[in-house]
Amino acid sequence: MKILVVLPNFEGGGAERIHVNLANEWAKSGHEVIFCALEKKGPLINLIDQKIKVIDLDCKRILFSLNPLIKNIRAIKPQKIVAAMWPVTTVTILAKLLSGSQSKIFLVEHCAYEKIFAKLLGHSLFSIGLSKTLSYIFANKLISVSNGVENSIKKITILPNKKFKVIYNGIPIPKNLKKNK
């Protein structure tokens, strides 16, 4: 299976690390994994499996990533798309729709959306909720890393419950702790 993972960059945040770990595991399981990063920067690049291709969209602003994402989705033809962190998630949904792709798309939310967080982002909860409601309806699943994150998104959106799934952040198991087969 061909999986496209869309992230803003590879800076040291927990969300980015989880997606690098997941991508590495998918690659080890025989899947073809490709990253599309708005900016190919950050220390986590060094943790990416050599089998994984990393595409640098070279976009300093998220909105400017729309056309490069459309082109890459068309060229790559992934079966699955995984995008993390709003507003990258919303732009990825738009790119998928405009590309004409039949890929299944999964959006991953790592942050609880409260007034103080929205203020830090420079947006109102209303505008965040509206953009999520209008775009996330087209996702196959909206994955939240905790019940708290899921509940915060449900408060600011009008999305059916069947769209939501909580999958807690995984942690990689060190090789010396894995059972021998």
Predicted regions, residues:
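Membrane-interface segments of envelope glycosyltransferases acting on lipid-linked substrates or membrane lipids
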Residues: 1-181
